[in-house]
Amino acid sequence: MKKILLLLTLVTPIPALADSIDEILEKIASNNLELQLQQNIMETKQIENKAENVLGDLSVTYSSFYEQGEGSDHGSEFVATQGFDFPTQYLSRHKQAELENASFNMQYLTAKREILLKAQLLCLDIIYLNQEKELLDIRLKNADRLEELYKVRFDAGDANALDVNRVKMERMNVQTLVAVNNAAHRTAMQSLLTMNGNKPLEFSSKEYPQIAEIRDFNALKDEVIDSDPDLINLSYASQAAHEQVSINQQEWLPKLELGFRRNTDNNKAMNGFVVGGSIPLFSNRHQVKISKVEAINAQLEKKDAELHIENSLMSLYNEMLQLKETMQSYDSELMYSSLELLQKALDEGEISIIEYFIEAESIYNKLLTRMEIENQYRK
C-alpha cells in the first residue's frame, strides 16, 4: 500500500504518516549522499543547458601589408565581427531549455522518490521486526516460566525428564528466533543508517502509521498519473521534442554577421562596417523530418508509460484489497486470549506439555503470519 501512497507524497505529502517515519524520511532526504550527487548532476545539466543558448565568440583579425622597395607604401586592416542567429531562434531555444531543465528536475525527483521508498519500506520492516520481537519476548518469558515450573515438578516427581527436555528445547528454539530477529533488525537499521549518510538515527516504533483508506481506484489513478515524476518528466521531454521541431524549421534562416572594419595606409585611415551572412542550404537537410519522428516517439513513450503505471497500479490495488481481507480474517485478541487459557490449563494439569506445545506453536505461527500479512499490506 505504501508503494501506492508514496507515488503521491512527493507532490502532496500525506499528513497521516507517523511523525517518526516522516522525520526519518526528512533526514534521509537531507543527508543521503546519492541524493546530493543527483542534485549536483541536475544543477550542472541545467547550467550547461542555459549556457548553450548564447551568442558566439567575437571574431577579431588584424593584418598588415606593404610593398617592397624604397618609399613603398604600407597599410593595415583591422576587422571585428560578431555572428548571431536569427532572433526567433534564441527564443525557441530558450523555451526548449526551460522544458529540458524541468525534465532534469523531474529526473531528480524520481531518484528521490526511489530512495525515500526504499527508506520507508525499511522503516516498515523495522516495525514488523519490533512487533515480532515483542511476540518473541512473550514467548521467551513463557518458556522461562515453564522451565522453572517443570524443574520444580521434576524435583517433586510430578514430571519426567522427557517433559523437562521438551521445555528446554522450546526455550532454545525461542532464543534462536530472538537471535535471528536481532540480526535482521541490526541489518535493517544499518541500511537505514547508510542511507542517512552514516549519521545517527533512532527508530523504535511498534505501530504502523495511520493511513487514509483508498476507496476509489479511478480517483487514485488520476491523482497518481497527474503527480508521478516519471510521467511529468516524459511530458516535458515530449514538449521539448516538439520545440526541437520548431528550432530545426528555423535553422533554414540565415546566420547573420555584423562588425567593424578599419583600413589604413600611409596617408589615410578608413572606418566602415561589415555585414554578412550564411544560408544553410545543406547543413539542415532532413533535420526537420528527424525531429518530427523524435517528437512522435516521445509522445508514444509517454502514453506507453501511462499504460504501464495504470496496470501496475491496478495490480497493487487488487493485491492491497486481498491482503486487507486476509488480514481482517485473523483475530489477534482471540489468539492472545487462547494463549493465556492454554497456560492456565497447563498449570492446572488439564493438558499435557505436548498438547500445550502443539497448540501454542500453532497460535504463535498464526500471530506471526498475521504480522507478515500486515507488513505486506502496509507496503
Task: Report the location of each language-model feature.
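Periplasmic alpha-helical coiled-coil/stalk elements that build and connect Gram-negative outer-membrane
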Residues: 2-3, 114-227, 316-323, 363, ...
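Sec-dependent N-terminal signal peptides
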Residues: 4-13
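Bacterial Sec-pathway N-terminal export signals of envelope proteins
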Residues: 17-59, 84, 92, 98, ...
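Hydrophobic/aromatic residues within transmembrane alpha-helices of membrane transport systems
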Residues: 28, 80, 126, 192, ...
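Alpha-helical structural elements of signaling/regulatory helical domains
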Residues: 30, 86-89, 114, 135, ...
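Amphipathic alpha-helical coiled-coil segments
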Residues: 35-52, 111-138, 145-147, 152, ...
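Small/polar-residue-enriched beta-strand and adjacent coil segments characteristic
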Residues: 58-111, 232, 236-244, 249-306
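Short, charged, amphipathic alpha-helical segments
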Residues: 94, 98, 161-170, 292, ...
